Curated annotation (Swiss-Prot):
It is an enzyme of class 2 (transferase). The lineage of its organism: Bacteria, Bacillati, Cyanobacteriota, Cyanophyceae, Oscillatoriophycideae. The gene is dxs. GO terms for biological process: 1-deoxy-D-xylulose 5-phosphate biosynthetic process; isopentenyl diphosphate biosynthetic process, methylerythritol 4-phosphate pathway; terpenoid biosynthetic process; thiamine biosynthetic process. Its cofactor is Mg(2+); thiamine diphosphate. Catalyzes the acyloin condensation reaction between C atoms 2 and 3 of pyruvate and glyceraldehyde 3-phosphate to yield 1-deoxy-D-xylulose-5-phosphate (DXP). Thiamine diphosphate binds at H72, G113, H114, A115, G145, A146, N174, Y286, E369. It catalyses: D-glyceraldehyde 3-phosphate + pyruvate + H(+) = 1-deoxy-D-xylulose 5-phosphate + CO2. Homodimer. Keywords: Isoprene biosynthesis, Magnesium, Metal-binding, Thiamine biosynthesis, Thiamine pyrophosphate, Transferase. Pathway: Metabolic intermediate biosynthesis; 1-deoxy-D-xylulose 5-phosphate biosynthesis; 1-deoxy-D-xylulose 5-phosphate from D-glyceraldehyde 3-phosphate and pyruvate: step 1/1. It comes from Gloeothece citriformis (strain PCC 7424). This is 1-deoxy-D-xylulose-5-phosphate synthase.
Length: 635
């Protein structure tokens, strides 16, 4: 059977092991071809091919529900649920999402982009099933990286207290999240995987039994026998899980279809919560990805033979994350109090560079954003300079800790929010739209954003040097503007002070962060129409430079704000509030992300869809404030 013929996962029922192995081969081929062409997550999905096939072969997915954690490990799931034939649109505008979306398929039972949510959602569905007197299976598939998240442990704690609620938790244990896992839980799982009795029984039991005359060929009961002997040989296998109220199976070879199918069939018969521990290899089937599991977690388009990224047509400036990591590491070399903290995102944030150079000044807490923030608060209490490098979208997970543990106590923690603004192909779960709004309302917190990578360097110095309380900096995904950078000697910025980049009497353009460059482009377009605009780089949304902005607003009589974030509660709102507070009643036009979700697409496509290109903004300004002028041509 060809994979393109499978439009429903129940078509796996009745297929032989050989046929299922062929399906697995086709999934890996399609997975590799697609990601090599258009980019996406590579290692996670390759590691769960057999797990997915085996589980779906034992379920009725017209009724039963499977909840995937994170979602980027669910590419095989997408191919088996009717999306093979348009899988080449993965992560492209109007194409298949890189994560799970309930609106995309009836088989995507719960949306996922952030880690550690699956067990909670699955338990909720299981309880709803029981409350409504229905009868179907619910399974959650979670990686060992996501299992370091407190939310997953909270859900396990709850589920283990419900002995009459049927729920299957499947641990996809590949010893990795994006980077190698950290912490006691990971260490415990590795002991289980790598214990000598488990390894011997997994590798040699069938071969040994073949030599016994009364056994002959390996019987269908071998997997059950193997499981029982593992328990006798290693009493501690799964002991912690079973003490928490789960029936434990494992560890199971995650690439042995026969063993997986037999184990899942046994587990389905268990009454109450059951935990199936599956040992997999991240990147399975692509040797380069197996050897470099961090580097091949996610890829831009690459050459399948060499594994090397396809070079761009022209050189690109260094990315913001790279500049951040380089600058912070240089500062940390001369300041042993600087401690970089990441929540399992060392590579993404660039803190792996700090780890390599100054390992004693680096902490990876695992997927534990709440802990990361309060840990930083504790470090700050004792005079250290904690720098929490975190994606904007993930800081949302620690909002209470930001308020309660940092800002109320006015502790000097430096939050560096990567991927702020429009992130592109990762879509709504990863867009960094909300940080300006959700942080601006918190007392004691200073918030800033650089206009380019050179100003990023100065803001890093500003944040490290600021000891009067907490401070946050947002910066985007992707490459800088190509401005000259300094290797040292960066000067801190005065807190709460912006700068004038261009003078004009007709209009005030206030840009924040990445939109400062756009504001300059808008001013150029307006200048072609005889309209001269003052352009201000705000630098700080809190405290806002009202000493600069208010007089300029009075002088020009027209104000336009530009930001790469949500309009509600954002930078434009801060400006409008300040003008009202100073009784300056001038028209204000705000440009940013409206009250909507921004789907996956290339960033420039999203900017155009949102009306945030320089030509679109200039046209709108002309129509709103200068109705006699002809609009420019939108490129």
């Amino acid at each position: 059977m060809h994979l393109s013929e499978i439009t429903h996962p129940n078509q796996l029922h009745g297929l032989s092991i050989r046929q299922l192995e062929d399906i697995a081969r086709q999934i890996r081929e399609k997975h590799l071809q697609t990601v090599a062409t258009s980019g996406g997550h590579l290692g996670p999905g390759l590691g769960v091919v057999e797990l997915t096939i085996a589980l779906y072969q034992t379920l009725d997915l017209d009724r039963d529900k499977v909840i995937w954690d994170v979602g980027h490990q669910a590419y095989p799931h997408k191919m088996l649920t009717g999306r093979y034939n348009n899988f080449n649109t993965l992560r492209q505008k109007n194409g298949i999402a890189g994560y799970l979306k309930r609106c995309e398929s009836k088989f995507d039972h719960f949306g996922a982009g952030h880690a550690s949510t699956s067990i909670s959602a699955a338990l909720g569905m299981a309880l709803a099933r029981d409350a409504q007197g229905e009868d179907y299976k619910v399974a959650a598939i979670i990686g060992d990286g996501a299992l370091t998240g407190g939310m997953a442990l909270e859900a396990i704690n709850h589920a283990g207290h419900l002995p009459n609620t049927n729920l299957m938790v499947i641990l996809n244990d590949n010893e990795m999240s994006i980077s190698p896992n950290v912490g006691a839980i990971s260490r415990y799982l590795n002991k289980v995987r790598l214990s000598e009795p488990v390894q011997f029984l997994s590798d040699n039991l069938e071969e040994q039994f073949k030599h016994l005359p009364f056994f002959g060929d390996v019987t269908p009961e071998m997997d059950r026998l193997k499981e029982g002997m593992k328990r006798l040989a290693v009493p501690k296998v799964g002991a912690v899980i079973e003490e928490l109220g789960f029936k434990y199976f494992g560890p199971i070879d995650g690439h042995n279809l026969r063993e997986l199918i037999n184990t899942f069939k046994q587990a389905h018969k268990v009454h109450g919560p059951v935990f199936v521990h599956v040992a997999t290899v991240k990147g399975k089937g692509y040797e380069l990805a197996e050897q470099d599991q961090v580097g091949y977690h996610a890829q831009s388009p690459f050459n399948l033979v060499t594994g090397k990224p396809i070079p761009s047509s022209k050189p690109k400036p260094p990315g913001y994350s790279k500049v951040f990591a380089h600058t912070l590491t240089k500062l940390a070399e001369n300041n042993p109090k600087i401690i970089g903290i990441t929540a399992a995102m060392a590579t993404g944030t660039g803190l792996d560079k700090l780890q390599q150079k100054l390992p004693k000044q680096y902490i990876d807490v695992g997927i534990a954003e709440q802990h990361a923030v309060t840990l930083a608060a504790g470090l700050a209490c004792e005079g250290m300079r904690p720098v929490v490098a975190i994606y904007s979208t993930f800081l949302q997970r620690a909002y209470d800790q930001v308020i309660h543990d940092v800002c109320i106590q006015n502790l000097p923690v430096f939050f560096c929010m990567d991927r702020a603004g429009i992130v592109g192909a990762d879509g709504p779960t990863h867009q960094g739209m909300y940080d300006i709004a959700y942080l601006r309302c918190i007392p004691n917190l200073v918030i800033m954003a650089p206009k380019d990578e050179a100003e990023l360097q100065r803001m890093i110095v500003t944040g490290v040097n600021y000891t009067d309380g907490p401070i946050a900096m947002r910066y985007p995904r992707g490459n800088g503007l190509g401005v000259p950078l300094m290797e040292e000697g960066w000067e801190a910025l005065p807190i709460g002070k912006g700068e004038i980049l261009r003078n004009g009497d007709d209009l005030l353009l206030l840009g924040y962060g990445t939109m400062v460059n756009t504001a300059m482009q808008v001013a150029e377009i307006l200048g072609e129409h005889g309209i001269e605009a003052t352009v201000v780089n705000a630098r700080f949304v809190k405290p806002l430079d009202t000493d600069l902005i208010v007089p300029l607003a009075k002088q020009t009589g027209k104000v336009v704000t530009l930001e790469e974030g949500c309009l509600m509660g954002g930078f434009g709102s801060a400006v409008a509030e300040a003008l009202l507070d100073h009784n300056v009643l001038v028209p204000v036009k705000r440009f940013g992300v409206p009250d909507q979700l921004v789907d996956h697409a290339k960033p420039d496509e999203s900017f155009a869809d949102l009306g945030l290109t320089s030509s679109q903004i200039a046209d709108e300004v002309l129509k709103s404030f200068f109705k006699t002028q002809e609009p420019s041509v939108i490129s």
